[in-house]
């Protein structure tokens, strides 16, 4: 964590505001984010139109500690593991902007080899095409951060890993790379589910690069949990 990195630096160079690199100043007290549910937000509520005309809700940020997200992510990953073990199902991931963060969170859970199949980190467009079967024409027409691409990524990850469900993310974590149409913080999600559905969602997160990535990991896991729990409930009612 941030405290450990701070300690390692202090072992080598005495810390002071004059000697500490700017990137390390305040590192143990990074931003904490508070997510506001604006899934049904309209144009007047601060939502931005996504590349396909869908609304990307803006997630607002409050100051605090980045460590706020760690227990939430760990809790979501643990819940996912419990329900997938109950179902006898396995999940795979396809990540771009999070760089393997979802898979890393999953594998922090002891025993996750029982329900986690494969993690794909397809950062480059060529990797999305090669490993997940995303058509180059789709990437060319819509860009990597788009609904058609994450839907294809999710379906490709599920098929390639022979998993029961999969999640895919592609976004602009910043600090650069945004545009008027796709500002920094825009993230597209895709979930390929065990019942054959492939669903998508767009979010607009605020904060720095780490904050955007943390929120992305958390939301990806929470939706997986929600969908897996629905499957478990449906089985119980039969």
PLM-predicted stretches and their roles:
Residues 7-10, 30, 85:
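Residue-level detector of transmembrane insertion/anchoring sites
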Residues 16, 44-45, 236-237:
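Serine residues within intrinsically disordered or low-complexity segments
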Residues 8-12, 16-18:
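Low-acidity, Ser/Thr- and Arg-rich intrinsically disordered low-complexity segments
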Residues 4-9, 34, 60:
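Low-complexity, intrinsically disordered or signal/transmembrane-proximal segments
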Residues 60, 64-238:
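Short alpha-helical segments enriched in small residues
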Residues 9, 44-45, 63:
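A general signal for intrinsically disordered, low-complexity N-terminal leader regions
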Residues 14, 21-34, 40-42, 48, ...:
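Short, often N-terminal, low-complexity regions
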